[in-house]
Amino acid sequence: MDTELLKTFLEVSRTRHFGRAAESLYLTQSAVSFRIRQLENQLGVNLFTRHRNNIRLTAAGEKLLPYAETLMSTWQAARKEVAHTSRHNEFSIGASASLWECMLNQWLGRLYQNQDTHTGLQFEARIAQRQSLVKQLHERQLDLLITTEAPKMDEFSSQLLGYFTLALYTSAPSKLKGDLNYLRLEWGPDFQQHEAGLIGTDEVPILTTSSAELAQQQIAMLNGCTWLPVSWARKKGGLHTVVDSTTLSRPLYAIWLQNSDKHALIRDLLKINVLDEVY
């Protein structure tokens, strides 16, 4: 039996709501409904009664509940034990492509230079969208997440690492926003709220990407502009701030599970500055 089906069953039984269960599992509501139907088909019984917003366990669902809890608990314990034996020297760090390119790449180098304390530690640099990385963190498939947004779940611990400055850059001097095409570099969902006020409300990006390197290479060819970290852009060279634009300060957070067995290691690693310029 697919353990994901049992996991979904337990979440729906806990929340009594398909929408809230979907949100907790980082799935769509239709995916949750499909999983429940799959489980019901495998067992040959209905597990829930559905009357609008009133979702209840059937008698069969009530009988399945303790077995599902035991199976999932055993499975999680097995996964943790196996992972501990195979990954005791591995440490995975997740972030978006733009964060790796603009600041975390340098930090990773500093971690290797300071390996005296943790000799033999093997790092994995994982690139993905924030939502995917949060899910991996929740499922203990990721040790540490670096992101521009504070955690929204109580089970996570976090540390504010500092702030970095974004400015609107183009490839030629003395350019105005109205003369340029906008390239959207993704800096997190909450950044889009600020972005709307800093770029014209009717401005449609001709390119959207999560890679700062790609965006930087395209602005000259597309007569464009994009938001880049000031410290990174200065090192790159050949970039100029748009005349009628402003700057924006962004926070950077480290996030990990509160009950992580690598809590002490994480604290040690974060003593090494993540940002070149911390303020």
Swiss-Prot record:
Residues 1-58 form the HTH lysR-type domain. GO terms for molecular function: DNA binding; DNA-binding transcription factor activity. Negatively regulates the transcription of the flagellar master operon flhDC by binding to the upstream region of the operon. GO terms for biological process: negative regulation of DNA-templated transcription. Belongs to the LysR transcriptional regulatory family. It holds the Pfam family HTH_1. Gene3D superfamilies: Periplasmic binding protein-like II (3.40.190.10), Winged helix-like DNA-binding domain superfamily/Winged helix DNA-binding domain (1.10.10.10). HAMAP family: HTH_type_HdfR (MF_01233). Keywords: DNA-binding, Repressor, Transcription, Transcription regulation. This is HTH-type transcriptional regulator HdfR. The lineage of its organism: Bacteria, Pseudomonadati, Pseudomonadota, Gammaproteobacteria, Enterobacterales. The keyword Iron does not apply. The keyword Transcription applies.
